[in-house]
Each structure stands twice: as structure tokens, then as C-alpha cells.
């Protein structure tokens, strides 16, 4: 594209559009990545949309760039939507700038991508990776022959005995078989007193004997889990339950290579290539302390020079490219533990951790009663006060809504006071909520809203282009009901439609940064106008807290003033086994009650007797709202239990776990 920078000629409509796109790309790189573009030519360029994170491979991008001259270096940071290129001369980089800006290419998934280039003073990338495997981790390449691999794969019959749930299950896009003992996913344990008939398959015997003889394992396994994964799916990060299995856990990768992510509790992440026919051995720290998981995607970032060499993926961004995943089957062997775990990692050991307060029962009836008392009734009674503290929409939710095509039909499931219903006037939005009083507030604001349950939305299947569910699903009291809520969202979407979901996070400190919920927020001089419009300083502070918090301003405390003993204290609500969470502190239980001190407006509010507390014409009664706060990876795991959806994006946003789903 030939662009007139001098302004002598009048820019065409397409040129104006291009300049806007290029400027936006420059702004996004500066804001989110700290990459500063310069206005004068240099040898180095940053290429927005040309990264591994966009599905652009090194080979494809290099072929495009070399048409402008010899490339001295092409740097492609892992999982990032941009790349750096360094040409030998400034003239060559100028040629790339003028000829490739706005160029359309097709990524490895067949989607159109437009490149936007800007000059940078220096192409650089801060290496944050670890260059060594986690202690106790071993990857052995070519541990079996191709003939042995074929025998193992052919021994798995996925069509027989599908009705027998004792050893075969379908986890949507992941098929699972158990031998020796069934692994119970709801409790992450095995029933040690109920072995499955038949033991381990005979085809595994010679391989296990070989591993024992060569010293890769010390104990012969008695439990086997076989998983089959389609490209694009993975496993949430987890640690195999300490009390269920012994130290050694080994896994064979068959059919396709994969990159597995290992993460230390302090935040260090290591990506490890598991080649086809390789053996992964986890012992000691890597087994007990580090989480392991597989990110759901169709391509892995690998080293270009050694694509399928086992071991750590180095952080050399001059040698990274994409590798397409295939159908992978894993054989994971474990030894069931018979004695209590006495490992050195008590902070993550289910046996050694300090006992937590009892949680709720899984009974559907009791779950419904809990939700009725500590969610439905409470929000109906605090609706007016709650609405007065909810004005400011969250930027990334606004971004999602504004990116939708004009005329899209969008459902806000659990819309509250409707603060997102009017964000984009070009959309047809409808809201629903379980609270009649909150729906009435929506109608007063001229929004379309109705009363219904999020598990049974009276809207035709496949009729929505998009849905949002903001701070709703964490109010359901069982894992099954939370998955049902996700399934209902998926039912509403047309094929290709997207859903944005926010839930409150257990991790209120993430990547060494405390959420605004823990930090609180001082009122600055610039906030006077909003403060003056609020009924109190406390209400202003509430509006600055994370989306899922809905915090009671009257109970806000400085987390630094809470002692360790007070943090663990389990205050109880009458007739409830759930602990009351202390606001502005970290969570120590996933199932909690969060207080709300109701402020009444004598001229408007009716004197409502709170159903969540005994006693009562208290002018400032306390209500307790039920929450299930989600751990890292839990929301993605719940989404994977839903059929016909794929996870487009997952991220952390100020104390909330968030995903974008797409109906397939």
C-alpha cells in the first residue's frame, strides 16, 4: 500500500482506514507490551498480528519478509500476537514497511490476517523462562518402537462396553478408560477397596518390565488411565492427588507429540516437549509440587531447529515456530498408595493440609435450598442498595460487546441492574435475572429484561449471536449445577456464537500482584464527582472492586490488619456449615458466605425482614451471599464438560477467572 505521509495528496478511504489500524496496533503494543514504536526508519520492525499467538508460523512469515531483502533475525516470542524482524539495511526495512503494511496473509488455520508494521529502535524480548526441567522430571525419547506403539493403540477398543461406567467414560472431547482402579474425577481419588476386574492390560506387561529393569520406575503400577485427545483440547493444570498415588507417575505419549506446561507455586512456568513414543517420568518435586497440564489449542510453540526433541522448550525467540497437533493417546500409569502421604510438600498435600471447614453437601435439594436462601432471597432484598453500587462497566467486557457485529442478538444471563445492556446501542440485547427487584430496575432504565432461572432461560435454542454471564455461575452450589449453567449458555448460542463468562477467583493474588479487592483503593481528588454522586464513601469503594466481588462496604477491612489466626477463623451463620469470608483477605475455602450490610433509604425502601438472618427490624441488617470461588483451571475444566463449545480465550481479570467460549 502506498501511503502519502506528507499530506500533499488527499488520502483515500482505504488509506485512512489503514492508518487507523496501524495506529491502533501501535497503541496496543505500547499499552499491553510496553513496546515503543518510533517515527523514523530503523533496521528493526515490530509486526502486529504476525506472531505465533496468531497462528502464523516462522516459515510462512519468513517467506513473506524475505521478498523485501535478507533477514538478519526473526524473533517470535511464544504465544504473542507479534514478531520482530531485523533487516541488514534500513533500506530493506523501509521496503518491508511500505510493501507489507496492511498485507493479508492466511494463517495455519486458514483464517485471514492483516499485518501492521512499525519501526522500533531495538528488537528485544525479556526472557522470563526457566532453562532447566523441574526437579524429578525426566523425558525419555523413543522408549518404545513404532510396532509397540501400534499394538498399544490397537489394544484400546473405544466402542465396546461404553455403558460400563466403572472403567470407561466420555468427558466430551476426551475419551477415558481406566484399568486396575477407576479414577473418580469428582473427588480426584480412587476407591482402594474396589479394584476393577482384569487388572492392567496384558499388552502393557513387557513394557512395564522393561521400565522396571532399566530403573525408570521402582514399583510396578497397578492403575492405568488411558486418555484420547482431539487437537484443540487439553487438560487443566493439576497435581495428582498425594493420598491416592505413590511418588512415581509415568506417562506414554502415543500418536502425536504434545507440549505440556509445568508450573511452580511461585509462578515459574516451564514448557516441556513430549515427543511421540516418549516416556514422561514425574517423581519428587515435579510430581508433588508442580502442577502439570496441557493448554487447549491446535498448534504448539516448538523449537524450529529441533521440533520434536524431548525436553524443555527453550526461550530462544529466534528459534520458535508452530507445530500442528494430531490425535494423541496417553497411557498414564500409577501405583495406588496404601500408606498415608508424608511428603515434604505439606502446602499442597491433601493429607497434611490443615483441615478446612466442612463444605456443602452435593444434594441437589440442599443446593437449591442454599441458593434460594443465600442468593435469590438476598439479592431480591438488597436490590436497590446493590444497584446503587454498580455503575462502572468493566473494560474487557465492554470491549467484548463493542467488538460484536452491528445487529447481533445478545443475552445477558444474570444481568443484575442492567449495566451492560446499554453499552452498545447497535446490538439487540435482552437481560434476565432471578431477582424480580433487579429486573424492575432494568425496566425503569428502559431495558428489555425478564425474570428467569439461569438453568432454564425461556429463549429459543441457537437464537443468540452472543451471551454474557458476569459474576453469576459462582452462585451455583454444586459442580453439576455450574456445568448446567454453562450448558444453558451454549444452548442459546448459534453455531459460531460466543459467550463471555466471569467468575470470582480463589487466587486474589496472581503473578505476584494483588487484585484490587485485596489492595482496596484510595479516593483521589479526581474521583470527587463520582464520590459526590454516591450515597457514601463506602459505596464508592464498592464500585471499584472486582466484578465478582459484590462486596459489602460496611465490612471492608485492611488485609494487613488481619492476623493469620483471624484469617483462618471460621465464623458461622446459624444453621450453616459454611464459613463467613472476611472481606479484603485471601480465601481459605472455595465455598463461602460473603456478608452484605444493607443500607436503607427510609423514603423509598420497604422494611423487609431479611430471610438470611434471625432477628430483625434491624435498620442495617446483614445478609450472607453464597459463593463458590474458582481455582486456576477450574472454569476451563467446567467448560470442557460442555458439549459443542471450544475455549477461544481464558484470562485473569482483577480477581476473576474469565473465558470466551464459541459454539461449534
Curated annotation (Swiss-Prot):
MF terms in GO: 2-oxoglutarate-dependent dioxygenase activity; iron ion binding; S-adenosylmethionine-dependent methyltransferase activity; tRNA (5-carboxymethyluridine(34)-5-O)-methyltransferase activity; tRNA (uridine) methyltransferase activity; tRNA binding; zinc ion binding
Which residues are noted in the entry as 2-oxoglutarate-binding?
227-229, 328, 334
**Region annotation Methyltransferase domain: where it falls in the sequence:** 411-664
Q: Which residues bind Zn(2+)?
A: 242, 341, 343, 349
The answer on whether this UniProt entry bears the keyword Oxidoreductase reads no
Entry binding sites for Fe cation: 238, 240, 292
Function as written in the Swiss-Prot or TrEMBL entry = Catalyzes the methylation of 5-carboxymethyl uridine to 5-methylcarboxymethyl uridine at the wobble position of the anticodon loop in tRNA via its methyltransferase domain. Catalyzes the last step in the formation of 5-methylcarboxymethyl uridine at the wobble position of the anticodon loop in target tRNA. Has a preference for tRNA(Arg) and tRNA(Glu), and does not bind tRNA(Lys).
Q: So what family is this one in?
A: Belongs to the alkB family.
Full protein name: tRNA (carboxymethyluridine(34)-5-O)-methyltransferase ALKBH8
